[in-house]
Regions:
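Metallo-beta-lactamase
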Residues: 35, 46, 69-70, 77-79, 129-176, 181-182, ...
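Conserved beta-strand hairpin/beta-sheet module of binuclear metal-dependent hydrolase folds
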Residues: 43-88, 187-189, 194-197
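Divalent metal-coordination and catalytic microenvironments
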Residues: 50, 64, 74, 88, ...
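Short N-terminal segments immediately surrounding and downstream of signal-peptide cleavage
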Residues: 30-49
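Bacterial N-terminal signal peptides that target proteins for export
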Residues: 2-19
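Active-site metal-binding motif and surrounding structural segment of the metallo-beta-lactamase
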Residues: 44, 67-71, 79-123
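Accessory terminal helices/loops
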Residues: 21, 25-35, 229-231, 243-310
């Protein structure tokens, strides 16, 4: 059995399994309705007393449970709500009081409407509500994402930080700008020494950078750097996609992002076209380790190019 926070060797080589989940990243509601979720299993991993990670078919979920109720980070897809709640009930039968959306993408917020109708309070950064409130177009995937229904929208929003005090834990939520999107937040479970990064961290493969909605390679690097400042050698890190990680894995990920930026930027500065930059294969030395996820190297280089052109 793999050590749950071992992320080298075999763990990174099974990333294709997690790529299946990440491949749903930009699913629209209509696509979700057509997909068969019947065989998806929600797996719970205990990190510390009262803190768990749930994995299924969307972004990894973080859970704080205890006498004060359930605090949940993200809710994957609407058809999985009952399975997610059943998995949580096995941990603790208390009601889900809060859902914190890490960002606006549908594989992290798809269960919002179901949760909102159950009386759960949905919380997110200001930009998450703004983006979810209107139709959006993701040109990188040629996907139109319709505005979310009212019940799915965050009812409490913040512009920088907010803190929850639940279950004997301090849950510090902080916005990191212009990273994966323009509305990303991470959650630090202070006493438990756990961090939920959301899609600021794709563990083991190239990330999607939604530069069309405020994301950037520069912001991703800066955001990961901020998380590394508070992580210690024993910190358990829940990524947006991929297996449970540690500080060393997050540091390796940041090194990769910097190498890609440093490979693409001189070409952008020299006035090369997007196709020229992609043809130059600036990620070639990294592709064996990072290029086996849902976003292939050429697509990732294209996103980095677009980010650096701004």
């Amino acid at each position: 059995m793999l050590n749950p926070i071992q992320v080298t060797g075999t763990a990174t080589r099974i990333i294709s399994l997690f790529g299946i989940c990440a491949g749903l990243l930009m699913a629209t509601p209509s696509m979700t309705a057509a997909r068969d979720f019947s065989k998806v299993e929600i797996k719970a991993t205990k990190l510390t007393a009262g803190v768990h990670m749930l994995s299924g078919a969307g972004g990894n979920i973080g859970v704080s449970s205890g006498a004060d109720g359930i605090f949940m980070i993200d809710d994957q897809f609407a058809p999985l709500t009952d399975k997610i709640l059943a998995a949580i009930k096995k941990i603790n039968s208390a009601p889900v009081k809060f859902v914190l959306n890490n960002h606006w993408h549908f594989d992290h917020t798809g269960g919002n409407e179901n949760m909102g109708k159950k009386g759960t309070v949905i919380v997110a950064h200001d930009n998450v509500r703004k983006l979810m409130s209107a139709d959006q177009m993701i040109s990188a995937f040629n996907k139109k994402v319709p505005a979310a229904p009212q019940a799915a929208l965050p009812v409490i929003t913040f512009n920088d930080t907010t803190t929850f005090h639940m279950n004997g834990q301090t849950l510090h939520v902080r916005h990191l700008p212009s990273a994966h999107t323009g509305g990303d937040s991470f959650v630090h479970f202070v006493e438990a020494d756990v961090v939920h990064t959301g899609d600021l961290f794709f563990n083991g493969f190239y990330p999607f950078i939604d530069e069309e909605h405020g994301g950037s390679i520069t912001g991703m690097i800066a955001a990961v750097g901020e998380i590394l400042k508070l992580a210690g050698p024993n910190t358990k890190i829940i990524p947006g996609h991929g297996p449970l990680a540690d500080k060393a894995a997050l540091s390796d990920y940041r090194e990769m992002l910097m190498k890609v930026r440093d490979g693409v930027k001189p070409l952008v500065d020299a006035g090369k076209s997007k196709s020229d930059v992609i043809s130059a294969k600036p990620t070639q030395a990294l592709d064996a380790e990072w290029g086996d996820g849902f976003l292939k190297p050429d697509a990732f280089v294209g996103l980095v190019y677009a980010s650096l052109k701004k």
